Amino acid sequence: MSVVDQKQQYNLNKLQKRLRRDVGQAIADFNMIEEGDRIMVCLSGGKDSYTLLSILQNLQKSAPVNFSLVAVNLDQKQPGFPEHILPAYLGELGVEYKIVEENTYGIVKEKIPEGKTTCSLCSRLRRGILYRTATELGATKIALGHHRDDILQTLFLNMFYGGKLKGMPPKLMSDDGKHIVIRPLAYCREKDIERYATAKAFPIIPCNLCGSQPNLQRQVIKDMLREWDKRYPGRIETMFRAVQNVVPSHLSDFNLFDFKSITHGSEVIDGGDLAFDREELPMQPVVDIEDQPNYQSERLDIIEVK
């Protein structure tokens, strides 16, 4: 192996280790996977779901609990959908899988006028089919491929357009109240997933086969966050930490905190008015050490990318 190949392998190993660490931490923090779980991994053919399946398979080998995986793809009969790609890939991978064929594309085209965004109806139909499939397969958890950037984008979408301080939960009960949905990539950065997908040469299937107009608001938010990440290194990390460090007494939601009960003699909560002023905030957000140009790991990572 040449020096260049060795360096590439080393970088890939380090990247995989980082993703394993982030996924493992999210699983532990939110108790996503338990002993005996049967995890239905929703596979769209995009970089996120491929990475999710790959990392979960990798974690299976060393996880402290036993769990099984079944990959599920919904073939919505979109024109040009390459039906052969996923069965060939999953068959070679050796993972249990199921391809569900439902002509939701035809239903959406019939209901939504030409030129209008079809994503909302399409996602509702897809969600119902996946819930039904999870029941048929005896899955105890449904795993989706949303990552940290998706969570932050949703937070800003709700703030800017919905008037809500609401993001995307790493774990939740499904709409029908019968399934637990998990997002093991919740701590993973999209740029890490992109690099991993490229390195693993996943057979990516385009997400715009339906011809629907993209969610323009989400794209605006995505572009904004990417620009911030370039201009202000560490800002994205700091914002995500904020989502995990909420202080209800210093917001204005009276359903979340009982402001009416505060009277003379009440105890000072979370530092009172001085909670913000006392803190010495850094001039620049803290950047992940592994993003530093001259960062060198103190030990070799022997986890091989396979």
Swiss-Prot record:
Transmembrane segments: none
Reactions it catalyzes: cytidine(32) in tRNA + S-sulfanyl-L-cysteinyl-[cysteine desulfurase] + AH2 + ATP = 2-thiocytidine(32) in tRNA + L-cysteinyl-[cysteine desulfurase] + A + AMP + diphosphate + H(+)
Principal localisation: cytoplasm
InterPro entries named in the record: Rossmann-like_a/b/a_fold (IPR014729), TilS/TtcA_N (IPR011063), tRNA_Cyd_32_2_STrfase (IPR012089), tRNA_thiolation_TtcA_Ctu1 (IPR035107)
Recorded metabolic or biological pathway in which this protein acts: tRNA modification
Subunit structure: Homodimer.
Name of this protein: tRNA-cytidine(32) 2-sulfurtransferase
Name of the coding gene: ttcA
